[in-house]
From Swiss-Prot:
One of its GO terms (molecular function) is RNA binding. This is Transcription attenuation protein MtrB. Keywords: RNA-binding, Transcription, Transcription regulation. The keyword Transcription applies.
Amino acid sequence: MNINSDYIVIKALEDGVNVIGLTRGADTRFHHSEKLDKGEVLIAQFTEHTSAIKVRGKAYIQTRHGEIESEGKK
């Protein structure tokens, strides 16, 4: 694992925020998921296995490219 891989910070702004890691390769698959409650923070890293991270729910997301807030369910 390369410790210089990008990290992202995800802070849940509501209960039940799902964070899902997606795999690399010919077939994209879910390989890990976490459920966060309001105020909980997850620090995630892109690795040789993780090519994408999906956030479902209202959360604050910080990366080296900037900051964004995802929208909750309406």
